Amino acid sequence: MPVSTSGFDAPARLGTLLTAMATPFKPDGSLDIETAARLATRLVDAGCDGLVVSGTTGESPTTTDDEKILLLRTVLEAVGDRARIVAGAGTYDTAHSIHLAKASAAEGAHGLLVVTPYYSRPPQAGLVAHFTAVADATDLPNILYDIPPRSVVPIEWDTIRRLAQHPNIVAIKDAKADLHGGGQIIAETGLAYYSGDDALNLPWLAMGAVGFISVWGHLAASQLRDMLSAFASGDVATARKINVALGPLSAAQSRLGGVTLSKAGLRLQGFEVGDPRLPQIPANDVQLQALAADMRAASVLR
């Protein structure tokens, strides 16, 4: 089996703890650039060595192309060389995805996150053509985002094996939760794997993943960094302890979803990023109370 990415240093080029950054909005719903810069700095200060801008948690379906590029520019300027910045470039339209990829590369992004085309449910041959076209559009490393709960269509293992031969396709963000299959792909292809489901962060490390692309990083970046460090040093017991301690956040995310969890959780921690854009909605008072209880149980809120 070809090993297309054996020489690619994903931790150095893309990071190991990347938070899929929420996009701050002002009360009138417009993009809040000043808060975006402060949020990016806050996350890097807390232990993130990478950020994803304009991903799912960043409400990419509801932001314009101009807003995406302005947000990317703002985050790059805010964190400088302290973290790797990955731009969300995936849509259900190949031409539009290529446009976003080129614009992100021109702005200075360090990598691209390209989600499986959603809604249109393309066949596997269509996925190969789509991901290849986006990967061909720039010289940036591409992370493919495999998330069947949102896209319906998974990236099948044989499709990943084919795509792994492309020099710019270097990593997978996995929200498919097939640990055994993913472990086989890691061994066969050399692709870097990132956990895309915080509840499975530690199991993915055991299968050979290099890190996380996280929602919980908004609220628990220092704990996730400690878990990564403990696992890397062979202290699995400490990594397990941290993983269990963060468990209440899983229940909260199941109730609220990643966007609302991130924004409501930051609000509870005293960092205001505004409400989501419709069709996402903010947490109500009852939900905030339940979230606060979960965050206290996870030791991420006093």
UniProtKB/Swiss-Prot annotation:
Active site: Y145, K173
Cystine bridges: none
Stored SMART domains: DHDPS
Site (Part of a proton relay during catalysis): T56, Y119
EC number: 4.3.3.7
Catalytic activity: L-aspartate 4-semialdehyde + pyruvate = (2S,4S)-4-hydroxy-2,3,4,5-tetrahydrodipicolinate + H2O + H(+)
Gene3D superfamilies, A to Z: Aldolase class I
List of residues binding pyruvate: T57, I213
Pfam families: DHDPS
Pathway recorded for this protein: Amino-acid biosynthesis; L-lysine biosynthesis via DAP pathway; (S)-tetrahydrodipicolinate from L-aspartate: step 3/4
InterPro entries in UniProt: Aldolase_TIM, DapA, DapA-like, Schiff_base-form_aldolases_AS, Schiff_base-form_aldolases_CS
Main localisation: cytoplasm
Record-level Gene Ontology MF annotations: 4-hydroxy-tetrahydrodipicolinate synthase activity
Keyword annotations: Amino-acid biosynthesis, Cytoplasm, Diaminopimelate biosynthesis, Lyase, Lysine biosynthesis, Schiff base
Top-rank EC class of the record's enzyme: lyase
One Gene Ontology CC term in the entry: cytosol
Localization per Swiss-Prot or TrEMBL: Cytoplasm
Gene Ontology biological-process entries: diaminopimelate biosynthetic process; lysine biosynthetic process via diaminopimelate
HAMAP family in alphabetical order: DapA
Subunit (UniProt): Homotetramer; dimer of dimers.
Function as written in the Swiss-Prot or TrEMBL entry: Catalyzes the condensation of (S)-aspartate-beta-semialdehyde [(S)-ASA] and pyruvate to 4-hydroxy-tetrahydrodipicolinate (HTPA).
Family: Belongs to the DapA family.
The name this protein goes by in its record: 4-hydroxy-tetrahydrodipicolinate synthase
Organism: Mycolicibacterium gilvum (strain PYR-GCK)
